[in-house]
Each structure stands twice: as C-alpha cells, then as structure tokens.
Amino acid sequence: MSSPLECAKYLLSAHTPHQLPSDDGSEVAFAGRSNAGKSSVLNTLTRQNALARVSKTPGRTQQLVYFTVTPQRYLVDLPGYGYAKVPKELQIHWQAFIDTYFHHRQSLRGLVVVMDIRHPLKEYDLQMLAYARQRGLPAQALLTKADKLGRGQQAQTLQKVRNELTKHFADHINIQTFSSKSRQGVEQLHTVIETWLGLARSG
C-alpha cells in the first residue's frame, strides 16, 4: 500500500512570511541542524530522489520550502540551522522568520526534528522542540543515520535521548530511529505524518 506522501510536489520557496501559502490548510514542518540529513529524510519519505535538494554544503536551505501532498496539505522544509558560515544578519533574519512561523502559523499540525543519531539534542534541537511544546503541537524527534551505529548503540542512544527529552518535556515528544539507507523507521514516520495531515492510504 503506497503512502500519499509519495505524491509530493514542489510548490514554492518563501523568504518572508508574506510569501507563505494561505493559512487554511494542514502542514508538517521538518527542522534540523545542517547536515542532520533532513533532505534525505524528505526524499526517502516521498520516494523521490530529488524532491529536496541534498547538498554537500551545510546550510544550503535558505528559505521555507513547501511541497504539496494533496490540495491544502503540505510538507515544509525549514532552513537548516546551526551552521557557522551563514552570515550573522541572515541568522537573525531566519530566527525572526521561524519565530513568527511557529507562533502564528495556524496550519501547522506537527513538527519533525531531524537529528544525527551520533550527535543528538544540541541546543537548537531543544529550541525547536520547545516551540512545538509551547504551541501544544505534536513533535517527533527523529534520530537519523541509524545505520551508522550497531543495534546495541542505537538502543543505548535512543534510551539516553528519551530520558533527556522526558526531563525537558515530560512525555510530550515522540522519538524514533531512522535510516534513509536501510529504510529503517520509514513506515513508522509515514504513519505519524499521515495521521497529522489527516491522510488516508490508497489500496
């Protein structure tokens, strides 16, 4: 049974709040540090190798990129954060834009925070999860590149991150491992996002 996410198509790139689509649909946002594997996650979820641009240059995503799944239902690729080579004034601009987006975007149904399983829960990751918590939105902490660790190390890291998230957010954040290479966790994430967007599977 195929996922409706596989129908995703590029819609637009927004540099300011005024360029966003009308705020009357449903959307799921993807946030993550530069090089956490966010573009690969989007491409894997949609089974499209070039939907989100995978770059060797961290911080390449410099706008909110919208992908239409069905009319009025979107996946949103947020700018990669935490990369030192992005000019300070641009960092300030994006921080203000992201603040506005999280506090005022009524269409937002959930947030996926993408983290490299080898370097989880940096300050920016916690900040993104805090945004979701403040809005009362569901959030999924996604530990990517799980294939880089053995099963034992994965389980150990998963438990460590779960304990840390519980300390900060009680039990309000879901957590899972994910690998674009082995497709580990893909179905689990499909289910989460389809539920948030109110999408039904086709036979």
Curated annotation (Swiss-Prot):
Keyword Secreted belongs to the record: no
Residues binding GTP: 32-39, 59-63, 77-80, 144-147, 178-180
Amino acids binding Mg(2+): S39, T61
Domain of life: Bacteria
InterPro entries named among the record's database cross-references: G_ENGB_dom (IPR030393), GTP-bd (IPR006073), GTP-bd_ribosome_bio_YsxC (IPR019987), P-loop_NTPase (IPR027417)
A single Gene Ontology CC term: cytosol
Keywords, sorted A to Z: Cell cycle, Cell division, GTP-binding, Magnesium, Metal-binding, Nucleotide-binding, Septation
Any coiled-coil regions, as ranges: none
Pfam entry (one): MMR_HSR1
Cofactor: Mg(2+)
Sample GO molecular function, one term: metal ion binding
Ranges of residues in domain EngB-type G: 24-199
UniProt GO BP: division septum assembly
Family classification: Belongs to the TRAFAC class TrmE-Era-EngA-EngB-Septin-like GTPase superfamily. EngB GTPase family.
Function: Necessary for normal cell division and for the maintenance of normal septation.
Name assigned to this protein: Probable GTP-binding protein EngB
Source species: Xylella fastidiosa (strain Temecula1 / ATCC 700964)
Gene label: engB
